[in-house]
Amino acid sequence: MADTSVQKLAAEVGKSVERLIEQFSEAGLKKGQADTVSETEKQQLLDYLKKQHGADKAPTKMTLQRKTVSTLSVPAGGGQSKDVKVEVRKKRTFVKRDDSELVDQAELEAKAKAEADAKAAAEAKQKADAEAQAKAAAEAKAKAEANKAKEKAPQAPAPKPKAELKAETPEAAAARAEAERIKATQEAVLTKKQKEEAAQAAEEAKKLAEVNSKRWAEEERLRLEAEKNGDHHVTTSKVARAAEDSSDMDDEKRGRRARNKPTNKKRGGKDARDGREKHMRNRSTAPQSMAHGFNKPVAAVSRDVRIGETVSVAELAHLMAVKATEIIKQMMKMGSMVTINQILDQETAQMVAEEMGHKVVLLRENELEEQVLGDRDDNVKLETRAPVVTIMGHVDHGKTSLLDYIRRAKVAAGEAGGITQHIGAYHVETDNGMITFLDTPGHAAFTSMRARGAKATDIVILVVAADDGVMPQTIEAIQHAKAGNVPLIVAVNKMDKPDADPERVKSELSQHGVMSDDWGGDNMFVHLSAKTGEGVDELLEGILLQSEVLELKAVREGMAAGVVIESQLDKGRGPVATVLVQSGTLRQGDIVLCGLMYGKIRAMKDENGNAITEAGPSIPVEILGLSGVPSAGDEATVVRDERKAREVALYRQGKFRDVKLARQQKSKLENMFANMEEGEVQELNIVLKADVQGSLEAICDSLTGLSTAEVKVNIIARGVGALTETDATLAAASNAIMVGFNVRADAQARKTIEAESVDLRYYSIIYNLIDEVRAAMTGMLAPEFKQQIIGLAEVRDVFKSPKIGAIAGCMVTEGIVKRSAPIRVLRDNVVIYEGELESLRRFKDDATEVRNGMECGIGVKNYNDVRVGDQIEVFETIEVARTL
């Protein structure tokens, strides 16, 4: 290869001339910009560069990473959508080429280019020579044929041309031939170059197809699977690639615009906003290749909606695949106002779903509870058990006194005020067998407790005082007995009194469906006296006779089951529950499930406080060891596993909480508009603590029943046990009164009560508690005012006074006229002015009041149109005490 200049070599290797001269200088060769470089000098420079950088040295690399994040909105079911973040990561590696490689590459490229040019020139010359020879031969042949034809053709006189054509000179012919040859050579080179480019493009396309064939096949397989399975997430890769390509194009466009656009000064205000808006309009958005995930059905879709015990509006909408607003509209049509987070009970949710055309499947969420309660080793052998007898009747009709005589113990003295406020459960051994008695309170407030007693009993004894007859609680007891389908025995008490009238009792009871067996009815009547014991033996015989007719039997061996009669929180013993065993045998150490509570029985005591280890059917017993205070009336069941008992108790607590919340929300929504219309209602806040659960429920029901449209009793906290410091703090913060029923406040609570001046009241009789709360509510009523006329004066004459104006000379015809009282001026019995007196005189002296039949002068303040014949009415406003 011929020598080349330094400048040309620098252009070939892609370096600046100064850098190349510097490298020549480092290699020991002094070169200038116009000097030539021989092959030997090139080789010497290449050897130096290889030695300097190392022949096997790895090239320097630089890796750049770029991460772009985009967000896709995909359907999530139920008419909702969710956002999915797509993150695209790109990695690019740049390799720094070595100088020796650049020199080798430049040398090879130059050599290849020279060889290609030489080869192309030789081929072009050869082709041009061949074409010239062929053209010359063709011209010679054509000329010979033309001469031959000319000789054969007859001579004809040729027309005389208008202008003689100039003959072509040899120099012009040679120039034209040379131009045609050069043109043909260029066309040949261009054609060859196009063929080479086409072949190279085909080769590259073939290589690209080989590289991408596997990836295309995999994408096609994934697409077919996605169409088959309906999975929309597979298309995320397509959208991500489209977003990436779009982002690359945006970056390239922004860079090109930034390079081409001249720099302007910073703009502000409207120009800047216009520019930003235009930029946002011109921005290209990523192509959305994902198809819509939901097509609106042309017909109504009926789904199987699985509904549990409780469900919120949002969850129900998701189950039915509709928007929550549709359910809210449907419930508004049904007359209920709900919110999206409101809890619906199973019945309401079922009604809504069926109204909207769906099939409802009610879930049994208490399968675990049924499994635990069904796993019992009950003995199928039934044995006769003692009857459970409930004594009912009106207050002070002698129920507890009757039971006291039967038990030979003074129980009535232990109850405050001589009335029963707890359910007393006792079993009595008689000569004819054992009988279990439940003594229920007779006060109206204990309706729920009495209803509980009727559910747990076999026979009801209705005690009616012979001197008092049928009373409201007597009628209520009859209703409870009939509702429980329990046989009724009437005990006509207080027969020792002189004014006793048993026939009147029979007549009054017959009006309520209780007919004596003497009158052809089904109910046994026993005349007795709890004070003298007259007729008590006949009553016991009647009870045992009735129990034989009922054939009362129960399983004696096996796991026990019963009902909670009463419960309380004892300060030393913890939660204590009185349980009436109905079947099986309850033993110390058993795992008991009582309503929302559970526990292992640590101790058992009978009604007299004696420790026992087991209790059979129809035996009342106190048990200790529960996790909390159960509600009276809950079923008590012995289970095998304490862990499963705990799970069932927690499930019941959650279910109770959900149902309670649903009930509260329903009450709030129903009363919302009523409260708006009625205005502000006075509230009497109460913190209530009682000794036992039954008394607590009865007091709460009674106090809640006292609420009126103007004053509402709000029991902000209730519980069983002593009043604690927490209760006192809550009462102080809520401006509430603290009420203790048979309980007292501890030392810390008393300190807080004194410091915060909280109103604390103790009660042992429910009458007094209700009466004082009613009095407190009466004091909270809005005052009522009434106008009372105290005097009337008739105008007989009118005088003019320069200081006051018109003075009415009057005669007091009724009552008394007071100086400080407001007045009305009446004309023809029509009120024309209402105001107050400015002066009241008797003769020339000022007077504070003028009585009936006396004359006086009256000056009306700010009113001068007093005429003869008018009447001046004097009145005063008094406050009238209101009652509930």
Curated annotation (Swiss-Prot):
Keywords: Cytoplasm, GTP-binding, Initiation factor, Nucleotide-binding, Protein biosynthesis
Region spans: G1: 393-400
Basic and acidic residues: compositionally biased ranges: 110-153, 193-234
Binding-site list for GTP: 393-400, 439-443, 493-496
Region (G4) residue spans: 493-496
Residues annotated as domain tr-type G: 384-553
Role, per record: One of the essential components for the initiation of protein synthesis. Protects formylmethionyl-tRNA from spontaneous hydrolysis and promotes its binding to the 30S ribosomal subunits. Also involved in the hydrolysis of GTP during the formation of the 70S ribosomal complex.
Protein name per its UniProtKB record: Translation initiation factor IF-2
Native species: Shewanella denitrificans (strain OS217 / ATCC BAA-1090 / DSM 15013)
